[in-house]
């Protein structure tokens, strides 16, 4: 396959092992080459049984976990929170407040700066697995 991406929306109590397995599955589909984390929410989802706001730092942790497992890009949905339909309850980089003076925006800005600094060392990296898991 030329391009592999996936959307990661774990619950706030998700196991880091399950998340790692999902990233590894995507990397495996690309023969060990990097994949793209196409969507994750910077704050809350609108469809979990409990839509808790992510604790400070958790979005950064999960983003670095994706990079450590082979993601060349870590993206977020959505940029600006919707004003209608069900996605008005889904988190966004810019909340209904309409400005960047929020914890979520500041955390994302910091994450972007950090990833920019390490990008030359992480983009395109490959990791050869020492074991295999049959996933059927």
Question: How would you name each of these model-derived features?
Answer:
Residues 2-136:
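Carbohydrate-binding surfaces of carbohydrate-active enzymes
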